[in-house]
Amino acid sequence: SAVEELDYVFLTHGDEDHINGMAELLEDQELGVRIRNLVLPPEEYLDEKLAGIGRTAARNGTRVVTIEAGQSLRNGDTDLEITCLGPECGTGMGPGNGASLVLGARYGAFGMLLTGDVELEGEQNLVNSGRLGRYPVLKAAHHGSRNSGTEEFLQIVKPAVAVISAGIENRYGHPHEETLERLKNAGCVICSTQECGAVMLRSDGSSLQIESFLE
């Protein structure tokens, strides 16, 4: 059945490939999908693009909130909890990939780590924060770039499945062979959109189904 409403939409940072189409979705809610809450990084990490989308959301009746490391959101109808693991406030880092929202989603025995575009420094900050834990599913950081998925990071997260979002024959060479090798050595099943197309995960809190669609 068609999705008519989204409780929460999270924007990790302001890169175009992470926000494209968001303003249009917010402006066309009467005819499209209703978005109840838009969640943004802390204000110190908002660039003008994110701030502009926030203003568009507010004008169209969507509640706009920010989330920072250590804060959580819980869906009252289920046991789904989403915790912000980064970025920390007060780093002086400014907007960009390194300041991407990093979110840990847990629902019963299911857990997924969503990493935005953080790379080496961002992953190390997560390791040092003490907030990082084990997540069965990892959304690989920065499209599986060379500087993501360090061995230390993977030893803590211990993912069984890694989902990589990357276009076919993209000019950046994502995902990088070294990153794929580290994920394989960590025992991951790799689901890359290059090979699988659209990837959908379904969980009832105990089991996990992975579906893909490729034209």
PLM segments and residue spans:
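Non-globular, low-confidence helical/coil segments that flank catalytic cores
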Residues: S1-E215
